[in-house]
């Protein structure tokens, strides 16, 4: 199979293949243009993987460009966060980071060109009047009384706008297109507005700022972008994208292509809704592991490879659809099953005392870090007279299907010996506090010599040597697949999306690095929390369970 055959196919790549074959372009140049007014989420990750992935596969270039035309809502903090997220996902932009603000002087010149051609005018209608004059989808707009000003008057007024002689909302520059157009975006859209705000890149040099639709297409052209890829909500904006480029003097002529944005079950992607979750403290910040932000997914234990694989699996189409959350979980589960070292942790402990094991003795057992990858090495796990096991792994009575520890019967401790439950001790409420067992010292790494069958295997940790740890059990943030459709999306929050418990982990996890994934055997995949876990206070986040526990709920 050739390299081209191995590439994922989609309609955008088919367009690129044809453009290259026809000689329309000799190379491919894409860009990822986020606005630095918030944190990236997994929907942005889809766009990152698409744009950077295309550049990689076609030996082309991909720019990282910040669409920084709205200084009031932007911050350098978001710039740095976005750069970190792109790098973390495994991508490098070509050359220096680009900013739309790099082109403010050039954009101003193009605005002057449109005015000189009679294609732009300074309007003094208020923002409310502009909305009123624009009309509706069923009714055409009506022209502003300022629409037919002379070129000379518009040039003078635009210069006054730049000089700060108009208050905010008192004047704007509009394109002169068609107030009767069936496309709202073509009804004399605003190109520049007055904003007295300090910009994180240009400081106080400007008090007029270009609008997205004017800036975006020109920035693409100035950077030599061949394929400008965005989501479907910008489909109508393509008409304005083309109109601007058709009416200014510029060499490069990029084209815009649209694909469906990511809609993921049991979460929300709207920046407004995500901001509401944070400001109302429904979650613990933008990097809360329940959030769909890249920083939240990273903190939860998702790997770059799992997110790239997810974006690959869902593909690129023009069809809007809702992606099952289990698809995302499947990607990280597959990744960690293949690559995560194993460890043992007991989340709901009950004590086991092995009465025929020497008091105070410690036997260091050697366990593989991965059952199928000997190259991942081994670790020492201490075995002692007292161990913790999961409370659910013991019953006083059970049927034959129960393959764990039962009173009077045997089970194997993972990587250790066969033990037999002899008796239990209970508290005043009847809760089991201690299980007294014996062990067969001849069963380390082998079956009982007399041929008796021991079918069950359970995990454990030494009661003396294990480390206490806070375990955060994260789950889906909402109880319904499409919370955005609810009248009050916040009312559908899953109150069990975070359950905090205290358990014990094996000593090898004392040095667990932040965000390093582990399979806690029989319990799921976990990672050390990057903000709260310390050597003296271990905190582990559940990334995903061993299996999809929501499937049964959804199929009921």
From Swiss-Prot:
Q: Where is this motif: 'HIGH' region?
A: 34-44
Q: Which residues cross the membrane?
A: none
Which keywords fit this entry according to its UniProt record? Answer: Aminoacyl-tRNA synthetase, ATP-binding, Cytoplasm, Ligase, Nucleotide-binding, Protein biosynthesis
State the oligomer form and interacting partners. Answer: Monomer.
Q: Which segment of this protein is annotated as the motif 'KMSKS' region?
A: 268-272
Name the positions where ATP binds: 35-37, 41-47, 231, 261-262, 269-271
Q: Which residues bind L-glutamine?
A: 67, 212
Q: Which family does it belong to?
A: Belongs to the class-I aminoacyl-tRNA synthetase family.
Q: Which CDD domains match?
A: GlnRS_core
**According to its record, what are the GO cellular component terms?**
cytosol
Which region is the signal sequence? Answer: none
- One Gene Ontology molecular-function label: ATP binding
Q: What is its EC number?
A: 6.1.1.18
Q: What is this protein called?
A: Glutamine--tRNA ligase
């Amino acid at each position: 199979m050739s390299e081209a055959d191995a590439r994922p196919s989609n309609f955008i790549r088919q367009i690129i293949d044809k453009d290259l074959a026809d000689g329309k372009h000799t190379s491919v140049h894409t860009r990822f243009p986020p606005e630095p007014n918030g944190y990236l989420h997994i929907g942005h990750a889809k766009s990152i993987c698409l744009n950077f992935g295309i550049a990689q596969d076609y030996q082309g270039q991909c720019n990282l460009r910040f669409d920084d035309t709205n200084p009031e809502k932007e911050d350098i903090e978001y710039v740095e966060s976005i750069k970190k997220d792109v790098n973390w996902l495994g991508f490098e932009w070509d050359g220096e980071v680009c900013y739309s603000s790099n082109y403010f002087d050039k954009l101003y010149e193009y605005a002057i060109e449109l005015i000189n051609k009679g294609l732009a005018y300074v309007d003094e209608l208020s923002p409310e009047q502009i909305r009123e004059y624009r009309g509706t989808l069923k009714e055409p707009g009506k022209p502003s009384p300022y629409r037919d000003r002379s070129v000379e008057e518009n040039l003078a007024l635009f210069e006054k706008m730049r000089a700060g002689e108009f208050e905010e909302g008192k004047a704007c520059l509009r394109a002169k297109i068609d107030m009767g157009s069936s496309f709202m975006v073509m009804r004399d859209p605003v190109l520049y507005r007055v904003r007295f705000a300090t910009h994180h890149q240009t400081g106080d040099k400007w008090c007029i700022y270009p609008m997205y639709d004017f800036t975006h297409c020109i920035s693409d052209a100035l950077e030599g972008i061949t394929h400008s890829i965005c989501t479907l909500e910008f489909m109508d904006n393509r008409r304005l994208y083309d109109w601007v480029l058709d009416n200014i003097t510029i060499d490069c002529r990029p084209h815009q292509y649209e694909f469906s944005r990511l809609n993921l079950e049991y979460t929300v992607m709207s920046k407004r809704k995500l901001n509401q979750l944070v400001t109302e403290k429904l979650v613990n910040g933008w990097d809360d592991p329940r959030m769909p932000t890249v920083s939240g997914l990273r903190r939860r234990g998702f790997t770059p490879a799992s997110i790239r694989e997810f974006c690959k699996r869902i593909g690129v189409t023009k069809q809007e659809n809702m992606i099952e959350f289990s698809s995302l979980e499947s990607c990280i589960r597959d990744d960690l099953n293949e690559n995560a070292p194993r460890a043992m942790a007991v989340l709901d402990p009950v004590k086991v005392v092995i009465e025929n094991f020497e008091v105070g003795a410690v036997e260091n057992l050697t366990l593989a870090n991965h059952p199928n990858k000997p190259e991942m090495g081994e670790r020492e796990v201490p075995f002692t007279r007292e161990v913790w096991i999961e409370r659910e792994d013991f019953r006083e009575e059970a049927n034959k299907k129960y393959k764990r520890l039962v009173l009077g019967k045997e089970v194997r401790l993972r990587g250790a010996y066969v033990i037999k439950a002899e008796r239990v001790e209970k508290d005043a409420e009847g809760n089991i506090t201690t299980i007294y067992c014996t062990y067969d010292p001849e069963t380390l790494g082998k079956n009982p010599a007399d041929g008796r069958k021991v079918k069950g295997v359970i995990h454990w940790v030494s009661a003396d040597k294990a480390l206490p740890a806070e375990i955060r059990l994260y789950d889906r943030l909402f109880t319904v697949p499409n919370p955005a459709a609810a009248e009050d999306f916040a009312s559908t929050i899953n109150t069990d999306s975070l359950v905090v418990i205290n358990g014990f982990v094996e000593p090898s996890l004392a040095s667990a690095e932040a965000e390093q994934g582990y399979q806690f055997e029989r319990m799921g995949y976990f990672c050390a929390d990057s903000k709260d876990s310390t050597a003296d206070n271990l905190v582990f986040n559940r990334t995903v369970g061993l299996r999809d526990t929501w499937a049964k709920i959804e199929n009921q």
